[in-house]
Amino acid sequence: FQFNPQTLPETHYLVTEHGNARKAKRWPLNTVFVSKNHASRYGSDQYVLNGLDWESYGAVDLDNIRTRFHFLGKAAWSVKNVSGAIRVAKKAGVELDVLGGNRINFRRGFRWTLSRSIHFHGMVGGSEKTGLLNASRGMIFPVRWHEPFGLAVIESLYFGCPVFSTPYGSLPELVPETCGFLSASASEMAEAVRTNRFDPRACHAHVKQHFSVETMTRNYLTMYQRVLDGETLNAQPPVIQDPARNLPWHA
């Protein structure tokens, strides 16, 4: 992951870059990225959107009575902006499940909030994770960086959860107007959360159509064939153009 080989192999190769480089460095010519925006920030137009094996996620209950919203991500990363998600939930007057972070840090004490309307679940997976997503009204995800892709976003959409996020990185590619709301304003996002006019079935259908493991595999096979045919995917070595972090967030 994020390994940049110093000596290129003699055989045909393809490198997938999944993250945001902190410093400008040259990537191999046959590098692909995980969203159109991600590629463009490296001066490339070569990308394959991620996809997941939805059959492995178990049953989705789109008729379930849903009461809370959720945040899903590495809450300890400041760019994921869990504090912003908590602010939005409080402004909207809704309860929030935080998946991927704990309320207590033994070096820092209580983190983010003591509110009883905010529920921390730590790192979750399996049936615990899918159970929480099946009970969620939507995902609040106000990231402050250019998200390269966002597996948590498509996981949430699969379970019928509209996504309320910032318009950075890949988010406009993943979340159409029928499946969520994008804004860098906490007040605007909170109002969208309050009204929540989105259809869970539309969210579920969107990701099944566009972000399946089968679609991703076909697109990678096309890339592999181009390389095997002697094509060089990028004319110049990709180099990150915009390593921006802490993008605007109006609390």
Q: Predicted regions span which residues?
A:
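Conserved donor-binding/catalytic core segment of Leloir-type glycosyltransferases
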Residues: S44-L52, S56-L99
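Short hydrophobic beta-strand element within catalytic cores of glycosyltransferases
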Residues: P162-S165
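Nucleotide-activated donor-binding/catalytic signature segment of Leloir-type glycosyltransferases, i.e.
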Residues: V98-G100, R108-G131
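A short, well-ordered alpha-helix in the C-terminal region of glycosyltransferases
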Residues: F198-T222, R226, L233-I240
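A short hydrophobic beta-strand element within the catalytic core of glycosyltransferases
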Residues: M139-F141
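Short alpha-helical segment that forms part of, or immediately flanks, the ligand-binding pocket
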Residues: T130, V153-Y158, P172-E173
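Nucleotide-sugar-dependent
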Residues: A76-K80, R144-L151, P172-E173
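Conserved acidic donor-binding segment of nucleotide-sugar-dependent glycosyltransferases
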Residues: L174-S187, V193-R197
